[in-house]
Curated annotation (Swiss-Prot):
MF terms in GO: transmembrane transporter activity
Transmembrane segment boundaries: 12-32, 49-69, 77-97, 102-124, 138-158, 165-185, 197-217, 225-245, 263-283, 286-306, 342-362, 396-416, 431-451
GO CC annotation terms, alphabetical: plasma membrane
PANTHER family, alphabetized: BLR6921 PROTEIN, MAJOR FACILITATOR SUPERFAMILY MULTIDRUG TRANSPORTER MFSC
Gene3D superfamilies: MFS general substrate transporter like domains, Multidrug resistance protein D
Primary site of residence: membrane
Source species of the chain: Shigella flexneri
HAMAP family according to UniProt: MFS_MdtD
Membrane topology: Multi-pass membrane protein
Protein name per the record: Putative multidrug resistance protein MdtD
């Protein structure tokens, strides 16, 4: 990229900065949840909603982000995303109750939902096609560093300052990013088709109310009848979307996508698989602090091997899938992740803390292999005219399933635990043991889906966007 103009390189730095902010925030909060609970006078069992409110908002807003960027301009939307994310961070730091914090996290989520996809779109518009891969590698590298630094930085800030600082550090960075965006980024626009507002609202309502209903009466404070009403509303909304999208060329996501078998299997497996794996980044630091008595900083440091294992495995995952095929790799990594989850629980409860970094490193390797395999399987056989829509749907499902996973983890803690648990409680480790056993079972379930994947070991990883028209 050395032959790119200076202005373009600065624009790539701005996009990379946005990726870093968004990825850092997805992990920096996890180690602070027990301290937040104590400060806000809440049970740690309720704090999973701090993560859910952010991730679910990202899932809901993702389908609209690309259309907004084309309609209003990439600079305007990227600037708006940074401003909303920064304001959300400020309101998070000022929150005095859990409900205030959840609303502020949702505002952060609106900004986060627009930041990454609009950043990708910006790179497509400012960089020549032949340099696109190199440019995307450059801007996504900070996004890989964010999860590495997040847990330890969050623990450090909580232990030596307060949890408010995990949000306050975003403010000066966000101000600089917003000013740089206005000064340096061009405002590309494109002619857009009419936005499928009806489909967007139906999907948003369906995803939001079903996730809320999953939290149960203990988590939401709602009666069983109200929970049943939420489930009914969510199911009706999703059924109405299916009816709306049938034979509708303007639908947010065309049902023609599901005529491709690998897409259907990959999407179903990704949804189920990320529900299980989405529990781990939330449960691990909470368990280390509340269940084992680790300090926030120590718990954050323990998460680093998992990220390192994930990053290291990305270098060889292509060769692994080419050698063994999607079915074998996905079934093996799904069952393997379940076993590693049990190994982590057993090692921790036995007090073999020196072994935990190695177990978490292994967990990161297995999880990374499964993620990469799920993503390429889902998209590899889509025709060109459905590839963009399929990628957007996969991105939405990834965020939705992670929010559901965290919700279920919180629900399990609530089912097995009392209203308040602490390190001094004699039943705390038993509560976590039952929760981890349940998680291991849930993580293993998608193996039944992946067992139906054709085991084509040739040309597995090349995303063959066959130039056939969708029928």
């Amino acid at each position: 990229m050395t032959d790119l103009p200076d202005s373009t390189r600065w624009q790539l730095w701005i996009v990379a900065f946005g990726f870093f902010m968004q990825s850092l925030d997805t992990t920096i909060v996890n180690t602070a949840l027990p301290s937040m609970a104590q400060s806000l006078g809440e049970s740690p069992l309720h704090m999973h909603m701090v993560i859910v409110s952010y991730v679910l908002t990202v899932a809901v807003m993702l389908p609209a982000s690309g259309w907004l960027a084309d309609k209003v301009g990439v600079r305007n939307i990227f600037f708006t995303a940074i401003v909303l994310f920064t304001l959300g961070s400020l309101f998070c730091a000022l929150s005095g109750t859990l409900n205030e914090l959840l609303l502020a996290r949702a505002l952060q989520g609106v900004g986060g939902a627009m930041m990454v996809p609009v950043g990708r779109l910006t790179v497509m518009k400012i960089v020549p096609r032949e340099q696109y891969m190199a440019a995307m590698t450059f801007v996504t590298l900070p996004g890989q560093v964010g999860p590495l630094l997040g847990p330890a930085l969050g623990g450090l800030l909580v232990e030596y300052a307060s949890w408010h600082w995990i949000f306050l550090i975003n403010i000066p960075v966000g101000i600089i990013g917003a000013i740089a965006t206005l000064m340096l980024m061009p405002n590309y626009t494109m002619q857009t088709r009419r936005f499928d507002l009806s489909g967007f609202l139906l999907l948003a309502v369906g995803m939001a109310v079903l996730t809320l209903a999953l939290d149960g009466s203990k988590g939401t404070g709602l009666s069983p009848l109200a929970i049943a009403g939420l489930v009914a509303v969510g199911v009706v909304a999703l059924v109405l979307y299916l009816l709306h999208a049938r034979n509708n060329n303007r639908a947010l996501f065309s049902l023609k996508l599901f005529r491709t078998r690998t897409f259907s299997l990959g999407l179903a497996g990704s949804f189920a698989g990320r529900i299980g794996s989405g529990m781990l980044p939330f449960m691990t630091p909470v368990f280390l602090q509340i269940g084992l008595g680790f300090s926030p900083f120590h718990a954050g440091l323990m998460m680093i091997p998992m990220v390192l294992g994930s990053m290291g495995m990305k270098r060889i995952v292509v060769q692994v899938v080419n050698r063994f095929g999607y079915r074998r790799v996905l079934v093996a990594t799904t069952l393997g992740l379940s076993l590693v989850t049990l190994l982590f629980m057993t090692t921790a409860l036995l007090g073999w803390y020196y072994v935990l970094p190695f177990v978490l490193f292994l967990q990161g390797m297995v999880n990374s292999t499964r993620f990469s395999s799920m993503n390429t399987l889902t998209l590899k056989d889509l025709p060109d005219n459905l590839a963009s829509s399929g990628n957007s749907l996969l991105s939405m499902i990834m965020q939705l399933s992670m929010s559901i996973g965290v919700t279920i983890a919180g629900l399990l803690l609530g089912l097995f635990g009392s209203q308040h648990i602490s390190v001094d409680s004699g039943t705390t480790q038993t509560v976590f043991m039952y929760t981890w056993l349940s998680m291991a079972f849930i993580i293993a379930l998608p193996a039944f889906i992946f067992a139906r994947v054709p085991n084509d070991t040739h040309q597995n990883v090349a995303i063959s966007r066959r130039k056939r028209s969708a029928q």
